[in-house]
Amino acid sequence: MDCCETALLAVLIAVSGTFRIPGIVPGTEFQLSAPIAVAVCGVFGFKKYIIAGILASLMGLSLGTCNLLNVAIQMSFRLGVGAFWLLSGSNRFFYIFSGPVGTALARLAMYFLLGKGLTLMLIAAAPGMAFTAATAWAFGKIFTRCHKAVRTSM
């Protein structure tokens, strides 16, 4: 059960990462996977979240949909969200702020890897941060309901 659940979460994170929601300004689109990843961490815990995230990154690498730079950025986001979860637990504060913190850390990692444009990257990421903050709680509620339904049916 645990192995299948982790694999399904990995696929959910990987597939949702392919969906881009356009922003108002060109270059400000964002991935649907951010609020989903926050919800996965909040509902299933850091261990299952980080394993599913690593598997999702490996899927992206093996399918050719991402490269090592993408994986470094993804892992920065995941570690930021995970650290926030470890500090605050699964509460409304976590769901609202962990995604933007993870995104900011991912942009900081890009800045250190590329050496340019931290302020512009953070500005471009702002709509996605707002979307993640606004929707992660709803995804968390959905995942909690699904998780409870699966546990009671076994």
State each model region's role.
Residues 1-154:
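Loop-helix junctions at membrane interfaces
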